[in-house]
C-alpha cells in the first residue's frame, strides 16, 4: 500500500481493517487516537473492499467462512471452547476454575503439551482440533479478533469476548459485537466472576447470516473499476493474472491441499 502511495498508483485495500475505520461501523465510546492513526496509516488506500459481521456499507461484505467449517456438523457437547492468546494459562485457569460445573476446553499458544487442572483442560493450538471443539461447543470464550468471533457467530454459538487492551481493531470489533448482543468482558480478573456467571447461566440468540460469498467477492475484485482503470493504464497489468490466481487459491484452498475446490 505504501509503495503504491509513494508511486501514486491506485491501490485496492482488501480485508477487515478497512471496515474497522468505516464510519458506518459501530465504534467504541472511547477510542485510542494514536491507535486509530496507526491503523489508518498502516496500509493507506482510498479504495477498499472489506469484511465485517454485517454489511454495514456497500463496500463491506460479511465474513468469508472457510469451507472446512461450513461442512462441519454443528452439535452441543456441553463444553465451552476458549481461545485467549493474549493471556497466560495461569491467568485463564484462575478465573475458569471458579466455575467447576463448566467443562472448559482451552487452546493455548503458551503450552506445547496438554494438561488438566480440575475442570479446565489446556491443549496446544491445533486448527483442526480447535474447529472441532468450537463446532461441538455450547459456547465460545475468546478474544475479539475477527475470524474466530465471526466463525463462532456463524456456528450460532453463545459468545463472550475479551478484547486485547491497546489493540484498536479488537476494541472496535468488541463495540460491534456488543451492539449485536455479545457479552464483552473487560478483563480476566476474578472480580469479573459475576459477569461470567451471568453469561454461563443465560442463553444468547444472535441470528446472523453468513452467505457463501467467496466467489462473489472474487468477481467483485476482478471487475472492480480500479483494476479496469489500471489495466488500461498498463501499470500493474503484469501482476494481474498472478494476483487473480493467488487470490482464488487462497480463498478456495486456504490449507494448500490438493483436490479441494
What do these predicted ranges mean?
Residues 2-6, 42, 52-60, 72-75, ...:
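Short loop/helix-cap segments at secondary-structure boundaries that form the rim of catalytic
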Residues 15, 19-89, 107-110:
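A nucleotide-sugar donor-handling region in carbohydrate enzymes
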Residues 64-139, 189:
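Donor-nucleotide binding loops and adjacent catalytic segments primarily
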Residues 194-261:
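C-terminal amphipathic helix plus adjacent low-complexity
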Amino acid at each position: 500500500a505504501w509503495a503504491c502511495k509513494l508511486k501514486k498508483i491506485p491501490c485496492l485495500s482488501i480485508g477487515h481493517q478497512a471496515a474497522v475505520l468505516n464510519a458506518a461501523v459501530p465504534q467504541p465510546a472511547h477510542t485510542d487516537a494514536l491507535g486509530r492513526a496507526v491503523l489508518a496509516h498502516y496500509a493507506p488506500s482510498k479504495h477498499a473492499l472489506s469484511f465485517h459481521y454485517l454489511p454495514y456499507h456497500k463496500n463491506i461484505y460479511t465474513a468469508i467462512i472457510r469451507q472446512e467449517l461450513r461442512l462441519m456438523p454443528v452439535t452441543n457437547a456441553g463444553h465451552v471452547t476458549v481461545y485467549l492468546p493474549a493471556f497466560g494459562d495461569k491467568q485463564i485457569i484462575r478465573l475458569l476454575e471458579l466455575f467447576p460445573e463448566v467443562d472448559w476446553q482451552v487452546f493455548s499458544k503458551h503450552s506445547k503439551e496438554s494438561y488438566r487442572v480440575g475442570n479446565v483442560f489446556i491443549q496446544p493450538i491445533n486448527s483442526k482440533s480447535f474447529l472441532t471443539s468450537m463446532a461441538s461447543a455450547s459456547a465460545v470464550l475468546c478474544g475479539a479478533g475477527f475470524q474466530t468471533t465471526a466463525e463462532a457467530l456463524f456456528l450460532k454459538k453463545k459468545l463472550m469476548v475479551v478484547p486485547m487492551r491497546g489493540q484498536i481493531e479488537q476494541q472496535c470489533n468488541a463495540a460491534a459485537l456488543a451492539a449485536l448482543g455479545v457479552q464483552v468482558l473487560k478483563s480476566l480478573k476474578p472480580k469479573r466472576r459475576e459477569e461470567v456467571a451471568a453469561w454461563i447461566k443465560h442463553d444468547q440468540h444472535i441470528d446472523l447470516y453468513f452467505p457463501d460469498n467467496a466467489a462473489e467477492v472474487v468477481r467483485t475484485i476482478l471487475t472492480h473499476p480500479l483494476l479496469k482503470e489500471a489495466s488500461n493504464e498498463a501499470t500493474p497489468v503484469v501482476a494481474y493474472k498472478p494476483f487473480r490466481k493467488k487470490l482464488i487459491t487462497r480463498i478456495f484452498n486456504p490449507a494448500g491441499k490438493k483436490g479441494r475446490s
